[in-house]
């Protein structure tokens, strides 16, 4: 299964590579083989990149799940206007080889949605969180608030977000993607009990990032 957010890019890539493949037939053999090989590799990588495997929802109302596949780059305390004082920032780095479909971390309603144009610093640069192009999203329910950002990077220059203000969402739902790698920052309220550590690998919609106390399924 392939991500619907990448269908246009995937179609363009396939057509371009197909054209290059057949044009290579008119070239000398020494040039023909590398062009055909490169075209085939580009097609295979595109198909691999835009894959969209099924995920099993956690099914626990107290769980805040990872919004992205990747590796936890940073965990630190921070104050934030949406989640309040003593919140926790968890940054997830997505390499070009991760699944790039993003998923909702918690049940609730979208109450904040804001796009910020910006730079394209490397995802490992901590300034990328504030300086890079990003889409900020805030979700709240009767018990809690969660804020997260799709952050573009040096290679990832296309953020896709199919959310609207006041939209009701459920944890694990697909909502967009960041094409060709970068990071996703999630900010959790002070009462959230962090359930992972730096270096941990995550799976969107399945890995529990934190738990909210006194909330039952």
Curated annotation (Swiss-Prot):
One of its GO terms (cellular component) is plasma membrane. Its cofactor is pyruvate. It is a peripheral membrane protein. Binds 1 pyruvoyl group covalently per subunit. Heterodimer of a large membrane-associated beta subunit and a small pyruvoyl-containing alpha subunit. Catalyzes the formation of phosphatidylethanolamine (PtdEtn) from phosphatidylserine (PtdSer). This is Phosphatidylserine decarboxylase proenzyme.
